């Protein structure tokens, strides 16, 4: 059974991101567009809570149900919500195209109901040596976010 979800991002960065997964055994395809980004890399993460009552700050930390350190999408030791970076050219829109085999739209670890956050700076993928590298990727301010909701198939 295919599951689809959508996230409308608001803030200084704005856009729409779609999620699609064919089954619980297949990767999630993430696609969409974001505007309002400066040229360069921007951290792109799923955060724990679907709470945006205090803007992006109330979405909590990266979604990390297994208590791992921050890492790159290809790392075994990473938060489930660590989706790496999206690259902006400085022109609108910035395209989002990610395929990830760790996140899911099924079961207890589903990202549906959680928040996507776009950050001001590049995610150093846990390798930067900064005090925040192993927790946030030192990706800077939260400049856009939205709750992931289930979408019509």
Curated annotation (Swiss-Prot):
Binding site for Zn(2+): 62, 70, 79, 82
Enzyme class: oxidoreductase
Cofactor note: Binds 1 copper ion per subunit.
Catalytic activity: 2 superoxide + 2 H(+) = H2O2 + O2
GO cellular component: cytoplasm
One Gene Ontology term of the molecular function aspect: superoxide dismutase activity
A Pfam family matched in the record: Sod_Cu
InterPro entries: SOD-like_Cu/Zn_dom_sf, SOD_Cu/Zn_/chaperone, SOD_Cu/Zn_BS, SOD_Cu_Zn_dom
Database matches in CDD domains: Cu-Zn_Superoxide_Dismutase
Binding sites annotated in the UniProt record for Cu cation: 45, 47, 62, 119
SS bond list: 56-145
Location relative to the cell: Cytoplasm
PROSITE patterns in the cross-refs: SOD_CU_ZN_1, SOD_CU_ZN_2
EC number of the protein: 1.15.1.1
Alphabetized UniProt keyword annotations: Antioxidant, Copper, Cytoplasm, Disulfide bond, Metal-binding, Oxidoreductase, Zinc
Gene3D superfamilies: Superoxide dismutase, copper/zinc binding domain (2.60.40.200)
SUPFAM superfamilies per UniProt: Cu,Zn superoxide dismutase-like
Needed co-factor(s): Cu cation; Zn(2+)
Family: Belongs to the Cu-Zn superoxide dismutase family.
Oligomer and partners: Homodimer.
PANTHER family: SUPEROXIDE DISMUTASE CU-ZN -RELATED
Known role: Destroys radicals which are normally produced within the cells and which are toxic to biological systems.
The protein, known as: Superoxide dismutase [Cu-Zn]
Organism: Drosophila teissieri
